[in-house]
């Protein structure tokens, strides 16, 4: 237990002395909020035909494939609440310690927790757009129709509405990716949280920090390719952030 306490003390020390702290988050922090991991053992991709859900060619042919599966998984997100990782990161930002959150997630829970500088490298459902014209609408506007399982359509031209999430077959949002690379390069300490670092190009972001002389800490329940680059390795996200939160409240 003493060793664990020392490890948490060391992690907290690195967090608070960092000049440019950045967090890089993945699906593991969403599972704490009751959202299934896409690739986990009970994840969405383990269910029949769900790989078609985020296939851009399938969407253009038949958008009902996406909306039929997404009505609960995506448009039920309004009912989900941030977990302790989300709330502690928001607190760190509010205190001026954390400079940016880079996330692979599409659940908007960082924003719901109060984080302001959130970079969504796989796109965001906060905006939906017509695939034919320039019309856009909010998540909430689209969700009204999407929750029924129907395909939301543009009020101007009648074409399907698509979330600004990156589907398979689409490029990542370049503006967000460039901003993420900039933040990772500036970071002298990066928290890698709940991601196994398997999906590129986002998985390479810790390398930007390391290349520029920064350090990383990894909190994930599975090994990653960057484990050998740090001695700050933790498995339990919830426990780790409870320990960070306890120390933060004493500051």
Curated annotation (Swiss-Prot):
Domain of life of the native organism: Bacteria
UniProt subcellular location: Cytoplasm
Any binding details for the cofactor?
Binds 1 zinc ion per subunit.
Q: Which amino acids does the record list as binding Zn(2+)?
A: 130, 133, 154, 157
In Pfam terms, one family for this protein is SIR2
Gene Ontology cellular-component terms for this entry are: cytoplasm
Q: Which family does it belong to?
A: Belongs to the sirtuin family. Class U subfamily.
Matching InterPro entries: DHS-like_NAD/FAD-binding_dom (IPR029035), NAD-dep_sirtuin_deacylases (IPR050134), Sirtuin (IPR003000), Sirtuin_cat_small_dom_sf (IPR026591), Sirtuin_class_U (IPR028628), Ssirtuin_cat_dom (IPR026590)
- List the GO molecular function terms: histone deacetylase activity, NAD-dependent; NAD+ binding; zinc ion binding
**How is this protein named in the record?**
NAD-dependent protein deacetylase
* Annotated keywords: Cytoplasm, Metal-binding, NAD, Transferase, Zinc
Provide the coiled-coil residue spans.
none
Show the active-site residues.
Answer: 122 (proton acceptor)
The residues listed in the UniProt record as binding NAD(+), with positions renumbered to this chain, are 27, 31, 38-39, 104, 106-107, 122, 195-196, 220, 237
Domain Deacetylase sirtuin-type, first and last residues per copy: 1-251
The free-text function statement in the UniProt record for this protein reads:
NAD-dependent protein deacetylase which modulates the activities of several enzymes which are inactive in their acetylated form.
Q: What is its EC number?
A: 2.3.1.286
Q: Output the PROSITE patterns linked to this UniProt entry.
A: SIRTUIN (PS50305)
Q: Which Gene3D superfamilies match?
A: SIR2/SIRT2 'Small Domain (3.30.1600.10), TPP-binding domain (3.40.50.1220)
Q: Which residues take part in binding nicotinamide? A: 38, 106-107
Cofactor(s) listed in the protein's UniProt record: Zn(2+)
Reactions listed under catalytic activity: N(6)-acetyl-L-lysyl-[protein] + NAD(+) + H2O = 2''-O-acetyl-ADP-D-ribose + nicotinamide + L-lysyl-[protein]
Lineage of the native species? Bacteria, Pseudomonadati, Spirochaetota, Spirochaetia, Spirochaetales
Q: What is its main location?
A: cytoplasm
């Amino acid at each position: 237990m003493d060793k664990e306490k020392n490890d948490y003390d060391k992690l907290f020390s690195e967090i608070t002395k960092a000049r440019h702290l950045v967090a890089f988050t993945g699906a593991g922090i969403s599972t704490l909020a009751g959202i299934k991991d896409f690739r986990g053992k009970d994840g969405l991709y383990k269910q029949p035909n769900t790989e078609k859900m985020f296939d851009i060619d399938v969407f253009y042919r038949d958008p009902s494939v996406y909306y039929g599966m997404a009505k609960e998984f995506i448009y039920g997100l309004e009912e989900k609440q941030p977990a302790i990782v989300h709330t502690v990161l928001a607190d760190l930002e509010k205190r001026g310690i954390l400079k940016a959150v880079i996330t692979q997630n599409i659940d908007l829970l960082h924003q719901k927790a109060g984080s302001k500088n959130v970079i969504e490298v796989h796109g965001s459902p906060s905006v939906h757009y017509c695939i034919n014209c320039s019309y856009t609408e909010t998540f909430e506007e689209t969700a009204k129709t999407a929750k029924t399982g129907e395909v939301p359509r543009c009020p101007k031209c009648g074409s399907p509405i698509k979330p600004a999430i990156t589907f398979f077959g689409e490029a990542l949002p370049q503006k967000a990716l460039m901003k993420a690379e900039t933040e990772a390069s500036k970071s002298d300490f990066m928290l890698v949280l709940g991601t196994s670092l398997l999906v590129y190009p986002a998985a390479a972001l810790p390398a930007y920090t390391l290349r520029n002389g920064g350090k990383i800490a990894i909190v994930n329940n599975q090994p990653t390719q960057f484990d050998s680059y740090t001695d700050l390795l933790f498995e339990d996200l919830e426990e780790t952030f409870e320990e960070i939160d306890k120390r933060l409240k004493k500051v």
